């Protein structure tokens, strides 16, 4: 009887665990809210921040966790059974961004409700979805007349509908994102439909020079869009005997630790500053530097003074730049490339670090302004940075009037006549309409006709 009572007690507890509480019941999916521009559209499938959002098909049932695949199973825990068959649903998301610049924004004379539109844009050349931004500089209606209204519009679509999230922000004088607003869920777009914020930012705050949102009376709106591209099911079977949880790769962290704690170092690099910064000494590893840089490889391979003494002195690179360069050589990563791009591109060119050099070119392209465009072009020419050079010339051509009023342009005219010639040649090519060659008419065939 005692054993029977214990069995009944255990059975009743098991049944209690199998019952799903009211708080555990799934919520119903909310339908689309079409009533107002500022109301959110809820989505039946919740979206995350990753490029590909996966949703495993194994749900919690009767109080037990089911492992849908080897990646989430625990090999040593007998309480977590492993599903022999599983499915992953991958919601693929395409992310892209767009910047819209409006010059002389304070002169916009549009009345309340009137619209300015950007040119159309898409995620890529083969993307059939066309988007544009539109603003109401003086608000959409009476309620928002003191605000700037901002929307994302689906101009062209080859589907019945598209789900997308978006984020708007304004770039200040330092090209930093400010006043960002984003949708918390994916919106349902159809062709000709827009979603956005009726009260994006107050006009008086935007126009106040002290806030620095209109440098040179130029409004720069940055938009990031995430579009649901497709949903793919991936199915498979689990081989229980091969369940291994592989830890993430820590190679970059381990290599940084090797650089930082000087363990097993066999070479000393002394870096002196021309700007008064303290001299720094780096204890490094010849094998790593030789593998990463052809310059260091040649230095260590031949019987040079540096190779014999296992020490070298560098006085043409600042110590903090040299440290960032060495961190990149050990880990393949760099934290401060945006702040050090001009100095790092010189160091990367000196030590023939081609990938780092292109990374610096990209960072400098993002930092292009009318004030520094000429200097950036001269920098690109000095270090044979072809991509940065082409981008700088194109930027100067697009903003020629503003660039020609800067001191950097005067330096370019005075010291770099060949570069100046290249800029004018590109400008002339851009402005001259293409020449259409007209072929002479073909001769008529001769006929034996008296007329």
UniProtKB/Swiss-Prot annotation:
<dbReference type="GO" id="GO:0005737">
    <property type="term" value="C:cytoplasm"/>
</dbReference>
<dbReference type="Pfam" id="PF22486">
    <property type="entry name" value="MATH_2"/>
</dbReference>
<feature type="domain" description="MATH">
    <location>
        <begin position="95"/>
        <end position="225"/>
    </location>
</feature>
<dbReference type="GO" id="GO:0016607">
    <property type="term" value="C:nuclear speck"/>
</dbReference>
<dbReference type="InterPro" id="IPR002083">
    <property type="entry name" value="MATH/TRAF_dom"/>
</dbReference>
<dbReference type="GO" id="GO:0031625">
    <property type="term" value="F:ubiquitin protein ligase binding"/>
</dbReference>
<dbReference type="GO" id="GO:0005634">
    <property type="term" value="C:nucleus"/>
</dbReference>
<dbReference type="InterPro" id="IPR056423">
    <property type="entry name" value="BACK_BPM_SPOP"/>
</dbReference>
<dbReference type="InterPro" id="IPR008974">
    <property type="entry name" value="TRAF-like"/>
</dbReference>
<dbReference type="Pfam" id="PF24570">
    <property type="entry name" value="BACK_BPM_SPOP"/>
</dbReference>
<feature type="region of interest" description="Disordered">
    <location>
        <begin position="51"/>
        <end position="75"/>
    </location>
</feature>
<dbReference type="GO" id="GO:0016567">
    <property type="term" value="P:protein ubiquitination"/>
</dbReference>
<comment type="similarity">
    <text>Belongs to the Tdpoz family.</text>
</comment>
<protein>
    <recommendedName>
        <fullName>Speckle-type POZ protein homolog</fullName>
    </recommendedName>
</protein>
<dbReference type="GO" id="GO:0043161">
    <property type="term" value="P:proteasome-mediated ubiquitin-dependent protein catabolic process"/>
</dbReference>
<keyword id="KW-0539">Nucleus</keyword>
<keyword id="KW-0833">Ubl conjugation pathway</keyword>
<comment type="function">
    <text>Mediates ubiquitination and proteasomal degradation of target proteins, most likely in complex with cul-3. May promote the degradation of bromodomain-containing proteins such as bet-1.</text>
</comment>
<comment type="pathway">
    <text>Protein modification; protein ubiquitination.</text>
</comment>
<dbReference type="InterPro" id="IPR000210">
    <property type="entry name" value="BTB/POZ_dom"/>
</dbReference>
<feature type="compositionally biased region" description="Low complexity">
    <location>
        <begin position="60"/>
        <end position="75"/>
    </location>
</feature>
<feature type="domain" description="BTB">
    <location>
        <begin position="265"/>
        <end position="338"/>
    </location>
</feature>
<dbReference type="Pfam" id="PF00651">
    <property type="entry name" value="BTB"/>
</dbReference>
<dbReference type="GO" id="GO:0030162">
    <property type="term" value="P:regulation of proteolysis"/>
</dbReference>
<dbReference type="InterPro" id="IPR011333">
    <property type="entry name" value="SKP1/BTB/POZ_sf"/>
</dbReference>
